[in-house]
């Protein structure tokens, strides 16, 4: 098996406060204060294949929530040389607006999503206020169309997309929240997506404010620790890019980092 290189792309950002991102923050007895939140998607590739992990928020989804766009995802994918027309597989870690907003950029791609995630967002509770605010209806409809067209690939608990790339359902944040494990030249990389928004969340067992099942989220932290990856990539932490090899030139300079050598 040829190992992969992972590229982390920061396409958006916002500023908020700690009590807005940590569940029941007042219980920790700590002062509130400012915190950043960055928005990422990921590209996994070697000489044989390219796999896209999430697609970022759309212009509409970002504007509806006053998020700042740093680079349009389409431009970022093109800068990386991702052949969108070739239909590379797309992993949907979960169906929130900031992860599936640009599925239309990949009209021929198979979409891989946990069955629990798809079932929830097409089920009877998806319109309830406390969960619905995190999605865009037309983007959920895109998943429905992909299912009708035969492009949606659901899995129960785990699936190997290719040698060295595994997707595992963790739950917690959403019913089908998934993570992606990738074998690279620099060891095993775990793309935690929103199973871990912030490194502090993971290290201090401080769940994010948006949670479908709190106990599953706590259990998810333990499951990720048990996996003992060489590198864990959080889903929204502003410190993420600084932990890895920066992309220093071109359109993505300062907005991307890599793990592993180009293969």
Map each language-model feature to its residues:
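Metallo-beta-lactamase
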Residues: 71-86, 116-169, 212-229
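Core dinuclear metal-dependent hydrolase active-site scaffold
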Residues: 8, 42-45, 51, 156-185
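Short, electropositive alpha-helical surface patch
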Residues: 61, 70-76, 107-115, 168-172, ...
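Active-site environment of divalent metal-dependent phosphoester hydrolases
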Residues: 15-17, 59-60, 95-101, 175-177, ...
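Active-site metal-binding motif and surrounding structural segment of the metallo-beta-lactamase
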Residues: 67-113
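Cap/insert and terminal regions of metallo-dependent hydrolase folds
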Residues: 67, 183-263
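Conserved beta-strand hairpin/beta-sheet module of binuclear metal-dependent hydrolase folds
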Residues: 13-76, 179-193
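Active-site neighborhood of phospho(di)ester-bond hydrolases with catalytic His/Asp-centered motifs
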Residues: 52-55, 87-94, 113-114, 169-172, ...
């Amino acid at each position: 098996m040829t190992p992969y290189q992972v590229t982390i792309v920061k396409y958006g950002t916002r500023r908020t406060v700690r009590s807005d991102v940590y569940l029941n923050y007042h219980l920790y007895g700590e002062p509130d204060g400012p915190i950043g939140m960055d928005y990422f998607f990921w590209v996994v590739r070697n000489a044989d294949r390219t796999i896209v992990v999430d697609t970022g928020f759309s212009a509409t989804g970002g504007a509806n929530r006053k998020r700042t766009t740093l680079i349009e995802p389409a431009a970022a994918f093109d800068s990386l040389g991702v052949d969108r027309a070739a239909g590379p597989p797309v992993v949907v870690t979960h169906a929130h607006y900031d992860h599936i907003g640009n599925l239309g950029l990949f009209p021929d791609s198979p979409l891989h999503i946990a069955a629990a995630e798809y079932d929830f967002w097409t089920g009877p509770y998806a319109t309830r206020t406390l969960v619905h605010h995190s999605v865009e209806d037309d983007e959920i409809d895109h998943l429905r169309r992909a299912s009708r067209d035969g492009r949606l690939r659901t899995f129960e608990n785990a699936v190997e997309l290719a040698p060295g790339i595994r997707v595992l359902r963790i739950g917690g944040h959403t019913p089908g929240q998934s993570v992606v494990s990738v074998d690279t030249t620099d060891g095993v990389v775990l793309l935690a997506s929103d199973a871990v928004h912030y490194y502090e969340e993971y290290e201090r067992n401080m769940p994010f404010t948006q949670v479908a099942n709190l106990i599953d989220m706590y259990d998810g932290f333990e499951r990720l620790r048990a996996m003992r990856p060489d590198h864990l990539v959080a889903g929204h932490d502003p410190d993420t890019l600084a932990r890895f090899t920066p992309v220093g030139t071109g359109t993505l300079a300062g907005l991307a980092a890599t793990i592993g050598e180009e293969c």
